[in-house]
Structure formats: structure tokens, C-alpha cells
């Protein structure tokens, strides 16, 4: 059984990886992925051995709060920004008390200059009050950190909590010594760390605030989509409008869409017209004109006029619901490149705690002065600095932050990745296989020329009258052409359809009732021929002389034109060193012509679904990483076989199960965009990981005091600043993906 839920109380990657590690060891858990950014978890487990309630209990034992839905956070007395501002103010106050005399004695009143026991004690008490206030403002670090430590799942908050608590306890001990006159020399006289506690917490709070704001901005794409989903709709029942919940709408319901309202579910306009904002699908800001017979999609907005529509999907299967599900999956899933960071994070925090304790003991032993309290002070500073400077957050944010921003950017381009692995793998593709109809071409054949042995208007009238009842795209092209030439309609009877061949009916022809046939060449037993040298889709019109003989009256030559800009985008793809193939069920002449005009490397014509499947298998066996680009309708087996499946979707045509990437702008440029965005994202992730590994590799030894003889020791306050800047730098680097642009050359 697969389930998704939310987990509150996670602060860093050590939290999420700890939950994965703990539950992953259980025999009944087949797979689990926990997303720190989304506060979500996807789990697959054996329902015969356990249930979701039992899994929730296991997570609660680890110190976290699993929930089936995210609850609104309790409104605190101070907002995050106010808490941060207060932390800065009180930190400056403590630093002023601690270092004011050092900078200039005139900055402090004489009673606080720490020149004697009384003034030292008074100064320290004021510092303690300021430090306790800052610690209260940052109490979440202590609550979460010690809780995680208690459950043997230490995280970043644990490092902060241990380090600052040790500094506070040491300072309280020094304060006691001053109060009781039990100090040994001038150095140990009132050597407090209250300002270090405050500065560390302030810097960490600043870093976390920047990080959270960036996360929220990156999650805006999903939030904006969810806001597009209306809760109710106007249903027409007995010629009256009834407001109903969207979840109660079923296929076939007639809905009224008012100006300025969102489309509730996918459907088709049956009365009226409108201009719809479909930017959430295609990324294009211009409104799209819709008339009777046109499809409309959930989440899009109607601008001006009202119209009636018939629901073709329920809410669960609507386009908007599928997009939200894809974005959720993409943000919740993990890329393979993140596995290294997860493995390191799983042992990182315990290792740092061990290193800090070892460094403390070593410095206590080897410190150059014989005085114990002086040595203890140096050892404590090293201990706190090592704990505080270590940054599992930089490692944990390196991958998910980049993927989060990349998915937001993708949605603005009309692209949706099924999961993080799809985003990661697209860059590796070296062969792309295209379907032709509806993918490279418009999928709407238009009449190129007409060859007639009878009066042209009569031929058009016969074709129009028979084809008007057909839903086939070729029939629609002929009907549209006949209507443009004002062909009259004839009465038809006895309509018969032979699937894959054509349609016939009895109608008036030259004063008598004749059986007229419209279809491909295999539909006829002609007694005469038509010489047609043009390439294209041939549709013949004839009359049945007998059961075994037909007379051809004329023929239509249709062509399915390539989409605008396809040739240029194919060239862009080939410039990346990618091989291209065209697989189509169309005849050899048409497929060859299309491949030649678009500059595609190879092609297979008259291809059945099995032929396409076999070709992709063959390419994969040769070591190629294959991307299949199709319309998602009849290419499902080929899409499933490919390494990366791209569906050029039109709303409800999307097949989420088959697709790794869905393009709602129905443009081949999306394929190029997906590959380039994948390349940019992985490059960004590697930059983040490089920085995170280098930072921890360099700064942890520095905090241990390896350069002490070079007079380079990091104070706890500087360590706190460095740690904050480390995670902030990863966040800011990830934000650079917002500026990702597709070059047109």
C-alpha cells in the first residue's frame, strides 16, 4: 500500500534522513521518501503487517508529528520577522555590555565597566538576562534539538542546542565564581560567553529566516495552482443554476461558467463562447478564444462572457488535479544525486558531536597555559565552535532546493516533471524518438488539393454530407474545406462505418439514390483510376456500381503541417549532439518527406505500436538513453519503454502514468527546454554540493584549532556567522535557477 502524509518538526536533512533510516529498517516498509522542504513523506508498506496509525506511532517516538494534512500553525504572539528583529536588538545589547569597555570605556557607565567584583557581576547579570531573552526567541532550536537527541536522532538543532547550552552553563559557572570570589587569575575573572550564545542564535535565526522565505517563494507555484481550484461550481438543473461542490460533479453535468470565474473541471463548451487565461497550462499570458466544441480545462480563468459547458472529467481526474499531483511528486521525490548527501548526513551530526568532544579533551590537555580555567575556556570555545560551525543544512538543502526552484521555473515554461529523477535524467538523453501526428505536426490535416471527375461543388457536397457525422481528424479537415467553399448539405441514410477504411451512405446523386463512399484506397474496388502525383494523405470519393465495383469520382489530398518552429527546435536538439528518429504509422512518402523537411536523422514508416516498441528496445540495447516524445494517446507502450517519456498534452489527453515530463504548451521547444533545464539544475546541485562539502571539510578543522600556531582561532560567534552564511549561500545559489532562460540559437 502507498500512502502520503505530512511530518512536522523537521529542521534539517538529518531529521528527514533519520526518519527514512529508522523506518527503512522495518521489514514491512518497502520504500520511504521524506521531503524536508515539503514536510511530506511518501511510503510504501505491507498492509498485512501494519497500518498507517502504527507508522505514525513510530514517527512520534522519534520526536516528530505526523499528520494526514498540514494544520495551520498556531498564531504566535510575535511574527517570525518581529522575533528576528528582537533577537538582533537584544544581541546588540549583550554585545554592547560585553565588548563596550574593550572598544571604549566611555561607552559604558562606570557601574558596568567590570573593574571590580560588583560591577562585573552586575554587567554579567544584564548579559544573562539578554541572553535568556534571545534563547527564548530561539527556543525552537532547543525544543527540537534536545528532543531529537533524546530519541538518538541528533540534527542541526541539536548541535546549536548543545553548543550554546554548554557556553551558557560555563558562563553561569564563571558568574558563580565571580559572585563567590573563587576566581584564580585575571583571565578567568568573569570570562563569559553570553554574547557568543546571542550572536550564534541570531545568525542562525537570520539564516533560517532567509532559508524559509526562499522555500516559501519556491513553493508558490504549487500554492498558486491550488488557489486556482474553485471549491464550488454552478450546475444547471431543470433550467436553474445550483451551486454545488466541485467534488460532487460527475461526467456529463452541465455547468455555467460566469465571467471572472475559474473552470471547475475539464469539459467542452456547448453554448456560448469565452476568452480563457490558460497561462497555468502553457505559460502563455495571452487569453485563448474558445467556442462551441472547444475543450476547456480546470484551473483556467474565464475573462469576459459566460458560457455553458459539459463536464468530461470529475475533479479527481481533472487537468489541475493531475498537475498538482505531478508538482507534489516532483518536490517530494529525491534525485539519485542526493543519495550521497543523504548518506553523509546520516552520520554527519553524530560525527561532529564526537569530533567536538575529542577536540575539547585534547585542548584541555595540550592548552599552553598551566591554569585549568584558562585551558577550560579555550577548550570550551573550540567545543562550541566545532558544533556551531558544522552545517548539515548546506548538505541537506543542496539538492532539494535546486529541484524546488527548477520545478517552479519549469511550470512557468508549461513543463511539468513527474519526479526528481525525471528532471535529473533528461540531461543524459542522447537519442530522441518522435511520434509524428500531433507531436511534430498540428494533428489537424488540411486539404491541400482536390482532384475531381465531376463538378467540384458536387464532389464537396457529397464529401461534406457523409463526413460531417465523423469525429475523425481527416474527416474534420474535409468538412472544414467544404464549408469554406459553401458546399450544400445532402440528406443521408444508411450510414455505415468501416473502421480504418472509410464511411458510406445512400444519398441523392444526379437524380438517383446512390451509395456514396469516402475513404482510403483499400475501401474501393475501382473500375477507373485517378492520377495523383502529390505526396499527402489521400481520401477518395466514389460511388458503388455493384457490391464488387466502385467508380471513383474524385480525391482529396490532405497534409498535416508541421507545427510552427519545429524545424528550428529540432536543429537546437541536434546541436546538443542528440540523435533523432521519427516513428509514424503514416505511409513511407509522407514520413520520409516530414523527416527530410525537419532534418530528422532516421525514420520508420507504417509503424504499428509494436514496431515503435521494438525500435526503442533496439536503441536501448545499443546503450542509448532514449527519450520518447508522443501525444500520450496511442503511444503508451513506447512511452513506458523509453528512459524518459515526454507527452505533448492537451489538457485531459495527458497520461500521467506514462509520462515522465508533460508539456502543456504542445510545443517541441519544450523538449529542448526540458533538457537544458535538467542540465542547468544538475550543474546547480553540483555547485551546491561542492560548496557544502568544501565548507565543512575546511571550517571544521579550523574550528578545531589546527591553525592555532598561526594565530588563527575561530570564536563561537564567528562560527555561528559562518554556518549561517553557508546554508544561505546554498539557498541563494539555487535561486539563480529563477533566471534560467532558453536561448533561441
UniProtKB/Swiss-Prot annotation:
Q: Which domain of life is it from?
A: Bacteria
Q: Which keywords has UniProt assigned to this entry? A: ATP-binding, Cell membrane, Copper, Copper transport, Ion transport, Magnesium, Membrane, Metal-binding, Nucleotide-binding, Phosphoprotein, Translocase, Transmembrane, Transmembrane helix, Transport
Annotated binding of Mg(2+), by residue: 631, 635
Name the residues annotated as catalytic in the UniProt entry. Answer: 435 (4-aspartylphosphate intermediate)
A single GO cellular-component term on record: membrane
Q: What is its main location?
A: membrane
Protein name from the UniProt record: Copper-transporting ATPase
Q: What organism does this protein naturally occur in?
A: Helicobacter pylori (strain ATCC 700392 / 26695) (Campylobacter pylori)
Amino acid at each position: 500500500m502507498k500512502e502520503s502524509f505530512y511530518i512536522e518538526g523537521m529542521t534539517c536533512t538529518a531529521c528527514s534522513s533519520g526518519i527514512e533510516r529508522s523506518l527503512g529498517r522495518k521489514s514491512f516498509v518497502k520504500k520511504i521518501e521524506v521531503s524536508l522542504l515539503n514536510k511530506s513523506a511518501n511510503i510504501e508498506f505491507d498492509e498485512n503487517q501494519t497500518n498507517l496509525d502504527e507508522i505514525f506511532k513510530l514517527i512520534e517516538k522519534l520526536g516528530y508529528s505526523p499528520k494526514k494534512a498540514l494544520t495551520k500553525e498556531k498564531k504566535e504572539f510575535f511574527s517570525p520577522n518581529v522575533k528576528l528583529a528582537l533577537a538582533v536588538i537584544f544581541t546588540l545589547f549583550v554585545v554592547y555590555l560585553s565588548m563596550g569597555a574593550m572598544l571604549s570605556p566611555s561607552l559604558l557607565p562606570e557601574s558596568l565597566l567590570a573593574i571590580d567584583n560588583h560591577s562585573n557581576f552586575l554587567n554579567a547579570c544584564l548579559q544573562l538576562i539578554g541572553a535568556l531573552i534571545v534563547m527564548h526567541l530561539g527556543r525552537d532550536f532547543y525544543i527540537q534539538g534536545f528532543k531529537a537527541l533524546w530519541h538518538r536522532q541528533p540534527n542541526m538543532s541539536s548541535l546549536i542546542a548543545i553548543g550554546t547550552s554548554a557556553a551558557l552553563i560555563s558562563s553561569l559557572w564563571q558568574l558563580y565564581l565571580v559572585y563567590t570570589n573563587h576566581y584564580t587569575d585575571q583571565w578567568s575573572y568573569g570570562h563569559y560567553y553570553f554574547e557568543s550564545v546571542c550572536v550564534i542564535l541570531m545568525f542562525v535565526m537570520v539564516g533560517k529566516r532567509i532559508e524559509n522565505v526562499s522555500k516559501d517563494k519556491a513553493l508558490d507555484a504549487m500554492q498558486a495552482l491550488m488557489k486556482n481550484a474553485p471549491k464550488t461550481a454552478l450546475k444547471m438543473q431543470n433550467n436553474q443554476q445550483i451551486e454545488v461542490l466541485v467534488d460532487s460533479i460527475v461526467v456529463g453535468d452541465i455547468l455555467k461558467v460566469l465571467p471572472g470565474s475559474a473552470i471547475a473541471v475539464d469539459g467542452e463548451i456547448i453554448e456560448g463562447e469565452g476568452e480563457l487565461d490558460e497561462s497555468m497550462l502553457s505559460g502563455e499570458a495571452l487569453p485563448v478564444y474558445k467556442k462551441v466544441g472547444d475543450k476547456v480545462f480546470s484551473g483556467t480563468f474565464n475573462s469576459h462572457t459566460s458560457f455553458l459547458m459539459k463536464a468530461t472529467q470529475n475533479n479527481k481526474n481533472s487537468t489541475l488535479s493531475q498537475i498538482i499531483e505531478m508538482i507534489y511528486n516532483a518536490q517530494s521525490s529525491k534525485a539519485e544525486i542526493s543519495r550521497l548527501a543523504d548518506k553523509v548526513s546520516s552520520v554527519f551530526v553524530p560525527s561532529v558531536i564526537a569530533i567536538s568532544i575529542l577536540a575539547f579533551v585534547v585542548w584541555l590537555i595540550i592548552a599552553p597555559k598551566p591554569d585549568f580555567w584558562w585551558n577550560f575556556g579555550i577548550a570550551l570555545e573550540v567545543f562550541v565552535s566545532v558544533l556551531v560551525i558544522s552545517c548539515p543544512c548546506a548538505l541537506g538543502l543542496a539538492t532539494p532546493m535546486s529541484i524546488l526552484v527548477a520545478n517552479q521555473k519549469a511550470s512557468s515554461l508549461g513543463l511539468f516533471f513527474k519526479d526528481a529523477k525525471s528532471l535529473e535524467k533528461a540531461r543524459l538523453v542522447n537519442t530522441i524518438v518522435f511520434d509524428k501526428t500531433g507531436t511534430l505536426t498540428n494533428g489537424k490535416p488540411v486539404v491541400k488539393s482536390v482532384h475531381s471527375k465531376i463538378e467540384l461543388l458536387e464532389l464537396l457536397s457529397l464529401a461534406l454530407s457523409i463526413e460531417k457525422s465523423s469525429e475523425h481528424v481527416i474527416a474534420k479537415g474535409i468538412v472544414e474545406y467544404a464549408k469554406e467553399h459553401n458546399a450544400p448539405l445532402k440528406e443521408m441514410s444508411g450510414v455505415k462505418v468501416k473502421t480504418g477504411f472509410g464511411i458510406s451512405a445512400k444519398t441523392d446523386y444526379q437524380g438517383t439514390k446512390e451509395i456514396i463512399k469516402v475513404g482510403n484506397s483499400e475501401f474501393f474496388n475501382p473500375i477507373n483510376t485517378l492520377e495523383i502525383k502529390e505526396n499527402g494523405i489521400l481520401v477518395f470519393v466514389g460511388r458503388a456500381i455493384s457490391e464488387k465495383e466502385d467508380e471513383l469520382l474524385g480525391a482529396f489530398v490532405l497534409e498535416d503541417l508541421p507545427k510552427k518552429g519545429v524545424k528550428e527546435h529540432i536543429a537546437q536538439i541536434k546541436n546538443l549532439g542528440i540523435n533523432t528518429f521519427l516513428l509514424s504509422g503514416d505511409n513511407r512518402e509522407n514520413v520520409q518527406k516530414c523527416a527530410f523537411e525537419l532534418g530528422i536523422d532516421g525514420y520508420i514508416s507504417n509503424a504499428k505500436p509494436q514496431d515503435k516498441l521494438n525500435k526503442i528496445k533496439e536503441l536501448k540495447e545499443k546503450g542509448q538513453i532514449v527519450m520518447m516524445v508522443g501525444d500520450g494517446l496511442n503511444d503508451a507502450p513506447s512511452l513506458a519503454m523509453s528512459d524518459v517519456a515526454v507527452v505533448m498534452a492537451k489538457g485531459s489527453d495527458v497520461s500521467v502514468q506514462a509520462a515522465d515530463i508533460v508539456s502543456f504548451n504542445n510545443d517541441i521547444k519544450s523538449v529542448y527546454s526540458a533538457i537544458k533545464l535538467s542540465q542547468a539544475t544538475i550543474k546547480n546541485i553540483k555547485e551546491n554540493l561542492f560548496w557544502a562539502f568544501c565548507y565543512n571539510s575546511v571550517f571544521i578543522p579550523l574550528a578545531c584549532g589546527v591553525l592555532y600556531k598561526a594565530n588563527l582561532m575561530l570564536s563561537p560567534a564567528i562560527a555561528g556567522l559562518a554556518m549561517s552564511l553557508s546554508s544561505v549561500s546554498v539557498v541563494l545559489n539555487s535561486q539563480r535557477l529563477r533566471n534560467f532562460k532558453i536561448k533561441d540559437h
